[in-house]
Design a protein with these regions (language model features):
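Nucleotide-sugar donor-binding catalytic core of glycosyltransferases
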Residues: 2-7, 13-74, 78-293, 307, ...
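Catalytic binding pocket for nucleotide-activated donors in carbohydrate/polymer assembly enzymes
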Residues: 257-261, 271-378
Length: 378
């Protein structure tokens, strides 16, 4: 199926089983699980926790420190179930090799063809790119919300039986519960081309503290982000909103560039998400390792005009420059693209309409997971 057409693929009689043990991370995996819950709610699939005898195989595949989501997918027309994994890590050159060998398909968030080409032909044939995504949860998840909390508790109990100190296991469980509770609903992110927007540009970014992070990338990354804030504020004036997220390092070294928006801690996520929806334009820059930031998926959901630094990685459904978003490679180019949209409401509206079509077909969790399951069970 072409995800950009109106042909809706259903998966009648298909069953998906979730592995929520070792390696499960609710913040990184919430998007995928949300889509599965939504598909189950509409009756497209049946969704269940993985049975114990299947978990043994997954435990042998999974690594404690690698946030991989494993699914067992069964379709009526297949004699053998498919084992599928989702890898949300930033790095395009880092793989969970055991999963690459054992799984039928390996969906990866950061997929860069030159890095994929370094794998064996057999491994390459299993790799599939993932569309832009973001951390979220469904308000209509029903019993799955309770199952998530129970999964965190059960994981902690399992770690205690393996000898992990009680306090450490408890803190891990508490952190997972907090992250889960802080997830915002899909609907909170979303807007349509009919929604009114403030004629301003939103750009927020974080600096890394060189005393805490090591590597030559730290200084370069910080310099680029500081320059972006300065250029946008100089070129756009009060039509540029945001700046450097408030951290001790940013407050000490760049007090004049601090953000004028609310702090973006997870505890205040709903407030920040509602605020971000208001702006006509949102600027996105690459994350570490050239990864696609979650904010790009959030921007598409909010139907802000997306002005993005050149995107290196691949998507399952192509995101097309000058159709779905405008692209830049320097801070001054970014300011130029923003001014184009601010000065041409008609162009901004067309961009929002095309981006909304893309979001509904390729990024909203339910349709994204429909696409991935269709590939897995083809």
């Amino acid at each position: 199926m072409d995800p950009m057409t109106n042909n809706i693929v259903t998966l009648p009689g298909s069953k998906v089983e979730l592995f929520l043990e070792k390696g499960f991370d609710i913040w990184l995996h919430s998007y995928f699980v949300t889509g599965l819950v939504q598909l189950a709610r509409e009756g497209t699939i049946s969704l269940a926790l993985m049975r114990r005898h299947d978990q043994v195989r997954c435990l042998a595949i999974q690594q404690e420190d690698y946030p991989l989501l494993l699914l067992k997918c069964t379709a009526p027309h297949h004699a053998r179930p498919r084992l599928v994994c989702f890898d949300p890590r930033d790095q395009s050159d880092v793989w969970q090799k055991k999963a690459l060998d054992e799984c039928d398909l390996y969906f990866k968030r950061s997929t860069h063809p030159p890095d994929t080409a370094k794998l064996t032909p057999s491994q390459q044939s299993k790799v599939r790119p993932i569309n832009p995504m973001f951390a979220t949860w469904s308000p209509h998840a029903g019993g799955w919300t309770a199952r998530m909390y129970w999964a965190f508790v059960r994981s902690a109990l399992l770690q205690i039986t393996k000898g992990q100190p009680l306090r450490e296991a408890f803190n891990t469980c508490l952190r997972s519960c907090h992250n889960f509770a802080s997830l915002s609903s899909v609907e909170l992110y979303e807007d349509t081309p009919h929604g009114e927007k403030r004629p301003q540009v939103l750009f927020q970014t974080r600096l890394w503290d060189p005393s805490e992070e090591k590597g030559s990338w730290v200084d370069q990354c910080n310099r680029e982000r500081v320059e972006m804030v300065r250029v946008l504020r100089t070129r756009l004036g009060n039509r540029c909103v945001g700046g450097l997220i408030r951290t001790p390092y940013a407050e000490k070294h760049y007090p004049d560039l601090l953000s004028n928006l609310t702090p973006t801690s997870k505890a205040k996520r709903p407030e920040f998400i509602r605020l971000c929806r208001q702006f006509l334009i949102r600027v996105n820059i690459k994350a570490l390792f050239d990864a696609i930031p979650y904010s790009l998926g959030e921007t598409l959901a909010a139907n802000n005009c997306l002005v993005s630094e050149t995107i290196r990685n691949s998507f399952a459904t192509p995101l097309i420059a000058d159709k779905h978003y405008l692209v830049f490679s320097t801070p001054n180019e970014c300011a130029d693209r923003c001014l184009e949209l601010l000065d041409s409401p008609a162009k901004a509206q067309r961009l929002r309409e095309e981006a909304h079509t893309y979001y509904r077909a390729a990024v909203c969790p339910k349709e994204a997971m429909r696409t991935y399951l269709t590939q897995a069970l083809a």
